[in-house]
Design a protein with these regions (language model features):
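Catalytic histidine-centered segment of alpha/beta-hydrolase-like enzymes
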Residues: 266-278
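Alpha/beta-hydrolase
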Residues: 157-242
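Conserved HGGG/HGGXW glycine-rich cap/lid loop of the alpha/beta-hydrolase fold
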Residues: 20-72
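Active-site loop/oxyanion-hole signature of alpha/beta-hydrolase fold enzymes
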Residues: 15-17, 25, 49, 61, ...
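Short beta-to-alpha linker loops that shape the active-site pocket of alpha/beta-hydrolase fold enzymes
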Residues: 64-68, 130, 269-270
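A catalytic-pocket lid/entrance helix-loop region that shapes and gates access to the active site
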Residues: 127-159
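Conserved loop-alpha-helix segment in the C-terminal half of the alpha/beta-hydrolase fold
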Residues: 226-269
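Conserved hydrolase catalytic core segment
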Residues: 96-139
């Protein structure tokens, strides 16, 4: 049994797939509600290890969503699939009144979970939850298709080693924004060994591209946000019109439609706030959770 403060990876079966989650045990005698972390598209739960370790006394669970990290999964055609997975996982784990921490796609998913399962979370801290303005969802069809896929479909998938992946990505956006610890965690835990030798991306390019392609399918997300009654902090990065994720795509009015929503604008940060400054992200989580 790992000691408190050390991560152990476990798995369970949901929707006919094996899902992994990474758990940091609470210090004996600590009965605070757990922290549950849901990651961004193309990443995985261990990218948030530096944040989890900022809470050494507390139980922290970082999920690997469908087709990411150590979880099984096939490409999706609707974002509700992610919600259905996470809801079932948290139900199996008997999670109640947790502090939900989401980033990008993961944050979007936690909003849907909280709206339909109000007993699961007591608070939410959402880093750029990619819930765009309502007009974005007026056409709920696929944003990208198999004939015209998202550019991530061309992402390099095979590497000789984690070190080779680090060497290739170290100076590229957005990875050059990450702290060295987060970048190394992303690479070391973001590859799977291949049976014939070498490594491949744990999140296949087809999987990542399908998430982006389905990004406007959840047209009911604003109605879901209006039903979330727990205190919710929306942390938004610098605003901009580009979609390169150095700026925030999140609708600035999102917090205002949530019964207990609060907006925190951080123009000094990008969409990758938890990766470029995990210490600051952990501070935000701790302060909001302690209210």
């Amino acid at each position: 049994m790992p000691a408190a403060g050390q991560a152990v990876t476990r798995s369970l079966r949901v929707n006919d797939l094996a899902f992994a989650f990474h758990e940091w045990r609470a210090k004996p005698g600590n009965h605070e509600p757990p922290i549950v972390i849901a990651h961004a598209t193309g990443f995985h739960g261990r990218c948030y290890s530096a944040i989890a370790e900022a809470f050494p006394d507390r139980r922290v669970i970082a999920l690997d969503l469908r087709g990411h990290g150590r979880s099984e999964g096939r490409p999706i055609d609707h974002w509700r699939t992610l919600f259905e997975d996470v809801s079932a996982i948290l139900d199996q784990l008997r999670i109640r009144r947790a502090v939900g921490v989401g980033h990008s796609m993961g944050a979007h998913t936690l909003v849907q979970v909280a709206s339909e399962n109000p007993e699961v979370f007591s608070r939410l801290v959402l880093f750029d939850p990619v819930i765009l303005a309502p007009e974005f969802y007026e056409d709920s069809g696929a944003l990208y298709t198999s004939d015209a896929p998202h550019p991530t479909i061309r992402r390099k998938r095979d590497f000789d080693s984690p070190e080779a992946m680090m060497e290739r990505f170290a100076t590229r956006d957005p990875y050059s924004l990450f702290t060295p610890r987060v970048f190394e965690d992303y690479c070391r835990h973001g590859l799977r060994e291949k049976p014939d030798g070498g490594f491949e991306l744990a999140c296949a390019p087809e999987m990542e591209a399908s998430v982006y392609g389905a990004s406007r399918t959840n047209s009911g997300i604003h109605d879901a946000a209006r039903k979330v009654k727990v205190p919710t902090l929306i942390v938004r990065a610098q605003q901009g019109k580009s979609m390169d994720f150095k700026t925030s795509p999140t609708w600035p009015k999102l917090a205002s439609i949530m019964p207990a929503g609060e907006d925190l604008s951080r123009p000094d940060r990008t969409h990758f706030h938890p990766f470029e400054d995990p210490e600051d992200a952990a501070r935000i989580i701790a302060e909001f959770a302690a209210r």
